[in-house]
Amino acid sequence: MNLQRFPRYPLTFGPTPIQPLKRLSAHLGGKVELYAKREDCNSGLAFGGNKTRKLEYLIPDALAQGADTLVSIGGVQSNQTRQVAAVAAHLGMKCVLVQEHWVNYDDPVYDRVGNIQLSRMMGADVRLVADGFDIGIRRSWEDAMESVRQAGGKPYPIPAGCSEHPLGGLGFVGFAEEVREQEAQLGFRFDYVVVCSVTGSTQAGMVVGFAADGRADRVIGIDASATPERTREQITRIARHTAELVELGRPIADADVVLDTRYAGPEYGLPNDGTLEAIRLCARLEGVLTDPVYEGKSMHGMIDMVRRGEFEPGSKVLYAHLGGVPALSAYAEIFRDG
């Protein structure tokens, strides 16, 4: 496998820490050891997160093309767009963000706080669009790029989650390589990795990276899209493309992509009671915050799987904390009493 042949622009602090979740593990019976790899602490750029790791491989391409404007898309409370805005500010580039109405949640301040507030503070041109949730290529995003061209600029396209970008899976191949180095220091290997999946390139990169040591199917994706067929297809397609890029040396099989669909409800961006319980439990036992759109759902999945005995006794499970905490303020009504 050859990830090193791709240029990388450093946007993160370095390897993200692995934190034992001792109190949560004990609360759930102590038979499974839970750990968190803190991608939410990976950068000093506006809270960082998993997209910042991905952008390290996109930015060299943007600079090589002479782009002056990063153009991205997401929902109103998109973590992706906030991270793109931060990187643009850091590099002295312009930024145009298309923010679509992906979540059926009504709150008078939803489009004024959290991620979107931070993006505006960092100077991004934020454009609200009424279109609903979709993980694919969007006309509104293509229109935004054309508007930059018409104004004499040179846009660089960064799709939702970086996922439909040809290089979008590379960052989390690097995640897997990083975990292997940390495992050597820890003296053990993780039996499972739990990760939230929506647009797919985070899990896709992990699948490729862990396929190198036979653990592709030990990456358990927790669907948060509530459109799991599309998410599974996108993960698989991106993983196969990424495997070719890094010369993995073996094909990605359908069985390599594990996507658990039990925890996405009631729909994208809205938490159910199990998700809310998981968010509060992790916060109160570990001081680790998760959000109701993504990480709360993957935390719910991991906790429920432990309770159901779906991990063998003695298993060591690594929870990939991808970020997302800035969105919590947009859900203040849900958490008004904690």
Swiss-Prot record:
Question: Whose protein is this, by species?
Answer: Burkholderia vietnamiensis (strain G4 / LMG 22486)
Write out the similarity annotation.
Belongs to the ACC deaminase/D-cysteine desulfhydrase family.
InterPro entries recorded for this chain?
Answer: ACCD_DCysDesulf (IPR027278), ACP_carboxylate_deaminase (IPR005965), ACP_carboxylate_deaminase_bac (IPR020601), TrpB-like_PALP (IPR001926), TrpB-like_PALP_sf (IPR036052)
Q: Name one Pfam family in it.
A: PALP
Name its co-factor(s): pyridoxal 5'-phosphate
Gene3D superfamilies, A to Z: 3.40.50.1100
N6-(pyridoxal phosphate)lysine: residues carrying this PTM: K51
Q: Which HAMAP family match?
A: ACC_deaminase
What is the protein name given in its UniProt record? 1-aminocyclopropane-1-carboxylate deaminase
Q: Which PANTHER family match?
A: 1-AMINOCYCLOPROPANE-1-CARBOXYLATE DEAMINASE-RELATED
How is the subunit organization of this protein annotated in UniProt? Homotrimer.
Active site residues according to the UniProt entry: S78
EC number(s)? 3.5.99.7
Q: Which GO terms describe its molecular function?
A: 1-aminocyclopropane-1-carboxylate deaminase activity; D-cysteine desulfhydrase activity; pyridoxal phosphate binding
Catalyzed chemical reaction(s): 1-aminocyclopropane-1-carboxylate + H2O = 2-oxobutanoate + NH4(+)
* GO process terms (BP): 1-aminocyclopropane-1-carboxylate metabolic process; amine catabolic process
Q: Which domain of life is it from?
A: Bacteria
Q: Which UniProt keywords apply?
A: Hydrolase, Pyridoxal phosphate
- Please describe what this protein does: Catalyzes a cyclopropane ring-opening reaction, the irreversible conversion of 1-aminocyclopropane-1-carboxylate (ACC) to ammonia and alpha-ketobutyrate. Allows growth on ACC as a nitrogen source.
Q: Which CDD domains match?
A: ACCD
